[in-house]
Amino acid sequence: MGIIAAGATSIPQDKCQRLTRHVWKHMRLSPFSTSLQPASGIIKTMRGDCTEHAVLLSTLMRSQGIPSRVVVGFVYVTNPASYAPHMWTEALLNGKWIPFDSTRGPAGVGLTHIKVTDSTLSDEVGSGTVLFVPLLSFLGRATVDLALD
């Protein structure tokens, strides 16, 4: 799947963008689940919440030789207007971790995303809930102010 989705390009940034588009286009969103599916299970159903999107995208990037990890934080949602817990992917490109979000489509990652922590998933077992524990310290206590120049 990774070879087909990445296309013929040899440029890692382009591969990541193509893989992100592929996951966004072919996966169906489902309600949040507390279990963390392995990529092999996600490929079979091609459905999941932000955690499955991030895990699959990270796995596809790694299959192309691109170091990647998942990120846990908050994303702005409009209904109701607030920041909600979310997971997306980062790829190591030219020595910098660059964010990609296959649940947001062409919108990508920007000011709508607030990173709290990241993981290679090598130390978490079974439950996606463990990854979201660091967010608990922010709930009900944090405010976000944007200053536009």
Where are the regions a protein language model picked out?
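Generic recognition of stable, solvent-exposed alpha-helical segments in well-folded globular domains
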Residues: 11-18, 52, 56, 65, ...
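Cysteine-centered nucleophilic/redox motifs
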Residues: 19, 46-74, 89-90
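Secondary-structure boundary elements
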Residues: 1-48, 56-58, 120-125, 129-149
